Regions:
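Intrinsically disordered terminal and processing segments
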Residues: 1-63, 67-128
Length: 128
C-alpha cells in the first residue's frame, strides 16, 4: 500500500510539473505579440504579384503569401500557421483584410495575439 501511494504521488507530481510547463509555454511570447504595432500598407505602390512574409516569435511564428492584383489584395494564403491555430479565426481575419483592403482592422476577439501575428506577417510581406 505504501508503494502505491508513492507511485501515485510521483505521477501526480509529474502531471503538475508538465501542467506548469504547458502554462508557461502558452504564455511565452504572448505579451510581446499582443503589443505589436501593425502599420497600414499603401497598396498603390505595389506591383501585381505574390509577396511572401513572415512573423517569428515562438508559437506565434507564421508565414504567408499575399497576392496583389490591380493594387488590391487578391488572396492571402498562410502556409505556416501559428501553433494552436484556430481556422475560424484565421479565415475571419483573412476575410476582414480582403473586405477592407488593408491590415488596419480590429483584431479577432479572444485571439488578439494570434490576429496581430498574422497581420504582422501580411505587413512584412507587403512592406517595400
Amino acid at each position: 500500500m505504501k508503494n502505491v501511494l508513492k507511485i501515485v504521488a510521483w505521477v501526480l507530481l509529474g502531471v503538475i510539473i508538465v501542467g506548469f510547463g504547458f502554462i508557461f509555454f502558452l504564455n511565452k511570447d504572448l505579451k510581446s505579440t499582443t503589443n505589436l504595432q501593425v502599420t497600414p500598407i499603401d497598396l498603390s505602390i505595389l506591383e501585381d504579384g505574390d509577396y511572401e512574409g513572415y512573423y517569428e516569435n515562438g508559437r506565434f511564428t507564421n508565414r504567408v503569401y499575399v497576392t496583389i492584383k490591380d493594387h488590391k489584395i487578391f488572396d492571402i494564403d498562410f502556409y505556416k500557421t501559428v501553433d494552436f491555430d484556430l481556422p475560424e479565426v484565421r479565415e475571419a481575419l483573412i476575410q476582414a483584410v480582403l473586405d477592407k483592403q488593408n491590415i488596419d482592422i480590429d483584431t479577432i476577439s479572444e485571439a488578439t495575439a494570434t490576429s496581430k501575428a498574422y497581420l504582422k506577417s501580411i505587413e512584412q510581406a507587403l512592406r517595400p
